[in-house]
């Protein structure tokens, strides 16, 4: 699938490096072969796995259907939390949602907000098949994730993993910087022009991107966002986001092994395609399960709200259609964090009406108040919807199923920036 080139490691600025990392030496950088316009020939098992995954994607897309507008809010955040988890960045759904709504929070939370924006851009901005994907598009996608870095492809050698800060001890060394532009042009053309099974195309595009590792940072999150671009452009899914990172985060070692198999030799490509297809199926199942849980929670919260009004002697106990409380309930899955100001703007009501509705929903146990360390009210949160995001993104890390009360598997340590 590629070749190696020998390079010399001789750091110009060795300040702060350990003695081992300061030591010069030679290392091998991997150069992947450019992608062909036609998909490679696969074995029967890989073809079958990809076809099965495509059927499952279509079924999940159909099941979620008209609810995708609300569900995608939760699915994108589940995907972004898990994609960041793989890179060692841990944020709870509630902290993410609050940071996104208030535009403030820890740097970790703001980083995941950036991941959310990149995933949204990968779907909305790059899914039009009439638009030819360019290297500039991919650079912009990465810049949304890592706005603190200069936009553009890397102009120096980078590496992945290892026990120190040196390519001599790295787990994997991507191609030299001077080859990155042509390899990325080739990848952009592949994403735009190649036909065939979308699952196979997404698997190859993602693995090739991760192999090129075209940026100094943000490669993993950008590469996983690219998966959604490929699937959406190919109409493999039209409505639903498939949270594939929730599966990758469940077994990071298997995910990395799959990428290594892709790089090893052509005969091992099938191994990666099968693993990717299986991850896609499991992610589709996660999306369907979330849809079912949200539908159940919608009914539960409305019932609890009606019961609360009845107990308080409010007549009628069922709020009228069009009431602010009903409008809030109908959109909570898509807007699980609220402020009085956001309710005023969203539903065009007065501050007094917004406060009354939020207070009534809080008294019924539908919403919770969130305060800062000094006791100042920050916002209202629909914690049970946010808990569903946690269940979705955690389920694979504890082996699937209902994860409430279970301990998650440890993720990777936060990576050093190279």
Predicted regions and their residues:
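FIC/Doc superfamily catalytic core
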Residues: 1-418
